[in-house]
UniProtKB/Swiss-Prot annotation:
It comes from the Eukaryota. It is found in: Cell membrane. Guanylate cyclase involved in the production of the second messenger cGMP. Residues 17-409 are extracellular. Residues 431-1034 are cytoplasmic. Disulfide bonds: none annotated. The protein kinase domain is predicted to be catalytically inactive. InterPro entries: A/G_cyclase (IPR001054), ANF_lig-bd_rcpt (IPR001828), Cyclic_nucleotide_synthase (IPR050401), Kinase-like_dom_sf (IPR011009), Nucleotide_cyclase (IPR029787), Peripla_BP_I (IPR028082), Prot_kinase_dom (IPR000719), Ser-Thr/Tyr_kinase_cat_dom (IPR001245). It holds the Pfam family PK_Tyr_Ser-Thr. The chain crosses the membrane at residues 410-430. It is a single-pass type I membrane protein. This is Receptor-type guanylate cyclase gcy-25. GO terms for molecular function: ATP binding; GTP binding; guanylate cyclase activity; peptide receptor activity; protein kinase activity.
Amino acid sequence: MLLLLLLLKISTFVDSFQIGHLEFENSNETRILEICMKNAGSWRDHRLISLPSCHNFNGLENAANLNYQYSVDLLIGAACDEETQTVSRLALRWHKLYLSSAPLSTKEKESTTIALKPHSLAGTAEVILAMCKSMKWKEIGIIYSEETKYTAHAIYDMLAEQEDDLKINVFLETDGLSNTYTILHSARALISFLTTLDLSKFFKTLKENAFRPLEFSIVHVDCNKSEISNFYTYLDNNAGEEPNPISAARLRKLYRHVALLKNSHDDMEKTEEFAKKYGLVPSYTLYKALILCDGLQLLNNYTAPRGNLSIVQQLPYLWNHVTNTETQGYSGPVFIGNDGVRLPYYEMHMWRDGKAVHVANVKPRESDYCGGNMTKNCYEFLPSSPLLEDLPPYTSDCGYDNNLCSDFHVFMIAAIVFSILLIPMAIAFYLQRKEHLIQQMPWRVPLDSISFDDNGGSLSASRRVSTISTARASYSSIFSGNVAEHAIVNKQKVSVKRHVQRRAITFSRQEMEMLNQLKYMSHTNINPFTGICFNQGSELIVMWQFTTRYSLEDLIFVKEQKFGRNFQSTFIKHIVHGINYIHNSSIKVHGALYLSNCVVDSYWVVKLTDFGIKGILKERTNHKELAPSSAFDVDAIHYKYLQLAPEHISAILEKLEEPRGTVEGDIYQLAMCIYQILFYMRPFAERQESIKELAHLLSSQSTAPLHPKVPEGNSFTMRLLSIIQQCWLYKPAARPALIKITDAVNREFGQDVKGTLIDQMIEMIDEYSANLEQIVAERTRELEQDMSVTENLLYQLLPKSVADSIRSGKTVVPEQHSSVTLLVVDVCQFTKFCEAFIPVHILETLQELYSSFDNIVQKNKAFKVENVGDAYLICSGIPEMSGFRHLREICKISLKLQAFMKTFKVRHRPSHTLQIKMGITSGAVAAGILGSTAPRFCIFGDTVNMACRMASTGNPGSIQLSELTANTLMEKFPSFMLEERGMIDVKGKGACLTFWLTGEKDIMRRQSSRSSCISQIKFELDEADNSKKMFLNV
């Protein structure tokens, strides 16, 4: 009936067709529509009347104005939802055609309205239905995020109303982690309305929890209008965050089964082309304006052939021509359903080889039943790539819970195979587990887990005795010159030794197996092996557990402690037990059984260390993976080598390398250790021959066997002494077995064990404390010596009065000194000097220069306050000095420095001349100590600034004095010769009169003996070098 009324209301043709435009606020729609009307021939000469809308419902008022005041023939615009539905109802009442750019469904608009926005939930549901039919999916699941809840529910309701064979097994909200069990056990084909973040989480859950994750197909419906490449790039980057490459590869394999379903109209390419063509800025507002242009273009295609715009009001004829037909618009293809709702176009993409591949188009088809409501067969799914065939089917042969497949026959076959292969499988499992343990390398220590002891450093520097470096170390090496250090590994203190690594180290399987065995060795008398750090820098670091009392060599020969029979028996038994455990293990031999490798913990338990590792290091050195240790010098052979078995000493002298240890060699060295514990003597200490001569005597087969001398009058039984001497036989096979040594030790000390374990511990502690008085006295003497060195160093850094106050514990209060003299020495062109030399040479040159300055200052009544870079500050008159003697002292020092610089040569470049500028000023300063942990003596005042100005404004090789200082010098000490320089501009002071100090009359009379002075200066330089070396050694 409405269409009949519209047919009756055909107005008389007028020359100007009026279009009423409800313009969105600040959208510039009018200009864009005028451009579109000019491009359309039938609209070019007609009037466009634009009134604002979408602001406090002014669009409703202006719609009425357009109808009643302007009598427009066509209404367009009103993009806001709150106005467009009401305008649609008004247009129906006025019998006007209304082109709306708002997203309206069939239920939300009237029959005279055409909804032009290509975003329709019903259309999206139609697209999903068409896709499922094309891919023969009969069961699906729908998952969505909280942000897409409205969209997902609307589409689900539309799909659920269809009388179709498409079944929705699951419809759940998830963040990628929750509700996943139900989802994974309900469907294999999933339609995703998740956010990109939730989708990435869901993929990780799918990878970890799904029984067969590669059976899942996921079609992700883009609700965020994101770029296609950005979507897949985000997923790929998310896979890159996996903890290992295998997990990342599994996740990327799952991404091959995800397809992105995207509205084609979300692509802004056509909008950008239009903006570029007409000089506009691409924006979403421009896109909405182009949607209105699509409506005008649609009507133009209908009216242009007829040449009469009034036929726009003939809606039945208009509807038949503009619906169910595809035309090209400004924003893309336009397809209006039979109810006046524009249907969207979709495209599908998949990810292959790092790029998005277009696999299908989904477009509307001509049908009398297609529109804004959910119908059937309104879309056709057009595949464009065979990649769609890679998506798995919608169901699994075994069902969603794997309940359709019977595993009975599988279990039967597995039981039979397991029964047949039980023993080989067990063996293979054992070997595999063993191999896995070897490849796991539990003995490897990461470099970042090692924290070196700041107070430890090189242990050789912590004692005065030269042998302490090996005695205090938890282990030693025969040929390595390295010194053990302390470090912290996993909150445990360890002893470490570094070896220079030349290139990447690759341990053989046999070596890794031995290191594993070392790592897992556990015995009371075996020091635990912490591990090795390698291929993480330029060093290989070997670590053993640290013991608090260091080694037996340290206790017996360095600390010179005397132990009774209880301690002796305990030490010997512990060593015997430890070596017995090593000989019965897969390591077999120790190879370096010295007292320095018998370390003692806080409970007086002896532990053997430094075994099983030297052969591996030697092999790595032969492969040039480690730098070789310092060459073995036969002429400077160490005393401890005399404790090796004769056959091993011969190998050392011949090959100059350490031989592999043997069980018989360990027996020989065990006897040497027992000898030293019993008699507190080093082997062959009574001999007069040199160590080299003793080594040749021991290795010689022609001479009589050479054994350590057993002291006479000892209290030990002949049984024990005899077994010790049998261990020293030259023939390895003739040496006694370890069990005989154990028996002799037990017989010797078995009667000494009396009382309970606590009684024995108390007795041992009493014996240990008996020698403490002598140790305390010795340590007191060492402390006094160290304090004397500290005092001398303190007097060099601070004035004597200040140093005495600090030593006595008094607080040093800042003081004001009314009359002192300062000398500032400035190295000329220091920047160019630094550019011409490498940093090491700069430091060496300045060290040599300033040491010479220090030597000159110390011979006068002055002291160096500080030197920073190229500045050197000297002060005289603190704390007190009668009269102006401090001025005379400073002048003498400056003249000596001037004379010294004439002969100073830069050692690394003798042709380079180094010059200094000096400035002298007398006056008042404030002096005091700054800092507590690292105190420094500092002076402040205008006198310091003036002295610096005198130095900076002077000439190279000259000594400049301020006017007041020069007048005082001429008055008090006329022997000094001054020359007036004149007025100069001094920063912060203005124009000042200054003088040059040119010499002293007494010194000038002695210039004839120039050569003798030069010799004296060279002597002083040598003394300065010696002082510097002594200072560094201290």
